[in-house]
Amino acid sequence: HLPQNDMPMLASAINFLLRDEEFDNLDQICDYYHEDRAELEKKLAEAGFSYSEEQKRFI
């Protein structure tokens, strides 16, 4: 499961999964963990993170 109460840890976990090529993109992660992508991005944006499609990671 993904850490839901710690936004830096959540961003780090997602970046780790993408970097280590466990998943090809954020949509695959959301599908696997049954997360709504828009809600996930909104929650992380409120904590100062934005998703870079080009870099395939939260920055």
Regions found by a protein language model. Name each.
Residues 35-50:
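Short acidic, Pro/Gly- and aromatic-enriched capping/linker segments at domain boundaries
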Residues 53:
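Short, acidic, Ser/Thr-enriched surface-loop or helix-capping motifs
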Residues 26:
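Helix-turn-helix DNA-binding elements, focusing on the entry/boundary residues of the two helices
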Residues 11, 33-35:
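Functionally constrained cores in energy, signaling, and assembly domains
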Residues 29-30:
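Short alpha-helical "recognition helix" segments of helix-turn-helix
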Residues 1-23:
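N-terminal acidic leader/helix
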